[in-house]
Amino acid sequence: GSCTASLTGSAVVTVTNDPTSTISANTICSGQTGTLTFTGTPGAEVLFTDGVSNFTVTLDASGNATFTTVALTADTTYTLISATTVTPPATASLTASATVVVVGLPTATISGTTSICSGSTTTISFSGTAGAVVTYTINAGANQTITLDASGNATLTTPALTADTTYALVSVALGSCSQNQTGSALVTILPLPTASISGTTTICSGTTTTISFSGTANATVTYTVDSGAPQTIVLDAAGNATLTTPILTAPSTYALVSVASMSVPVCTST
């Protein structure tokens, strides 16, 4: 005959999902570090590369992780390679990527070094990154700002200056990116020339006398005789000049009109 026995038992096949991860990156200013953000299977070890070196991060219990890059000066792409879990043991190939976008730092320069006559104005020019805000000082005073236009230029007209004045760059900023800047423009002030006249006297009709001028060395003095046409005389290196009048038979007035320096630019006083 045949024998029959009843049996019991089972086999359980557990199917687990492959580990996963996503990657994202931020935008930074040149010279800063970037931040990569990973999200995926809790506990997974994520392998990724920048095309030169490989790196790993482990996702926390919430499935998140961040990674700080080295300081970057150019856009850099990071690509996922794989995600691996220990329990259960599994590895999945990944291909997603994210790029840390690097924004170049703004720049600025300053120009306008010149010499002007005391009491005059001049123009200081700035150039650099379009739209940037340039911070500068005047004679190391409080910070002031000027914004570059769409062409990357800006100018300012100084007030009337009577002493040497230095306009110096401090920094430049555009959005969240900024850096210190160096450079300056020196406005040198040339003193106004001076002149005086002497020689008031009484003489006998038909005689001559001497008129004396003094003032800034080498300056050109303009004067009139009895309100006539302007005439000039040049002071010597000691700042002096004299002239002998013609024979006079009536009172005569010698009057100063102006004095001009030999400097560049020429400075004039009246």
Where in the sequence are the language-model features?
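Short, exposed coil/turn segments at beta-strand boundaries within extracellular/luminal domains
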Residues: 2-7, 29, 86-95, 117, ...
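Short, solvent-exposed loop/linker segments at the N-terminal edge
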Residues: 26-32, 114-120, 201-207
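A short beta-strand segment in extracellular, disulfide-stabilized domains
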Residues: 32-39, 121-127, 208-214
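Solvent-exposed loop segments of extracellular immunoglobulin-like
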Residues: 42-47, 130-136, 217-223
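Solvent-exposed segments in extracellular or luminal domains encompassing
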Residues: 59-78, 147-167, 234-254
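Conserved structural position at the C-terminal beta-strand
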Residues: 82-83, 171-172, 258-259
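Proline-enriched interdomain boundary motifs that mark the N-terminal boundary
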Residues: 17-25, 104-112, 191-199
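Interdomain boundary/hinge segments at the C-termini of tandem beta-sandwich modules
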Residues: 11-17, 98-104, 185-191
